[in-house]
């Protein structure tokens, strides 16, 4: 791991939070996880790296002006950063989250409004089909339409062997990580039109086959395939469907679901560090905007430099 960090530092000439200097503070958290309970450093939502190894506030350009988005898991982590950057680009959002995560959701709403956007809160359990339908109905009622669907919410729990992986956890992973993607896409697409987009959050694990996250990895592979199939259905209607496949990201999901040993390995990417949520959220801005007008059915790989050939 030291050689990876040294290589990253040598390549950049810097040692900052965004290069090789961002060390994960090992900690324990329970589920559902609260971003407000994380030990420092706080996840970064609105700043992006600069060439000199520092970072600056994200520079918006009105790329999503007037757009309306649904973002699942929008209370914290990647979802929170997406909601904030969407607001900076001119979009309003309705964020869905578990009822136990209300404090984080309120903080996201405050940040979104600080950057000029509207943020509608919808606490719910998306493993239930009827709640997915109600989320879409409420979004249309409050915002008037849906232009962007961000399927982002996820569950994971490390288990080292298939013999120890319970049937209940396997089902929970699929009920959380892929079934709502189907339900929400099915219901939201009834209200979407040409130029609108669906952005799904997959994972590098779908490509590397992480053994201690077998169920999670399987659902993320399903999301990649779902993205490709839905794209082939919807592209004739002018609706683009893409996925983002992050590597390790400093979010509440990490300390609440990973062992201390696993957390210690999060910097073992070619870049020598995990990502910040802001670095993943920029991909969701790109895919939701006209900057990516020629991209559909594809996956972006902000994974710290892991070559996946997929």
Regions found by a protein language model. Give the residues of each.
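Conserved mid-core segment of classical short-chain dehydrogenase/reductases
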Residues: 128, 133, 137, 141, ...
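Residue(s) in the substrate-gating loop at a strand-loop-helix junction
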Residues: 203
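Active-site helix of classical SDR
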Residues: 185, 219, 227
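Short C-terminal tail/terminal secondary-structure segment
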Residues: 208, 271, 285, 296-310
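Amphipathic alpha-helical dimer-interface segment in Rossmann-like NAD(P)H-dependent oxidoreductases
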Residues: 137, 141, 175-196, 231-232, ...
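Non-catalytic terminal and boundary segments that flank Rossmann-like NAD(P)-dependent oxidoreductase
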Residues: 1-65
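Catalytic Tyr-X3-Lys loop
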Residues: 147, 155, 163-182, 199, ...
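Short, small/polar-rich loop/turn modules that mediate ligand/substrate recognition or access, typified
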Residues: 235, 240, 295-297
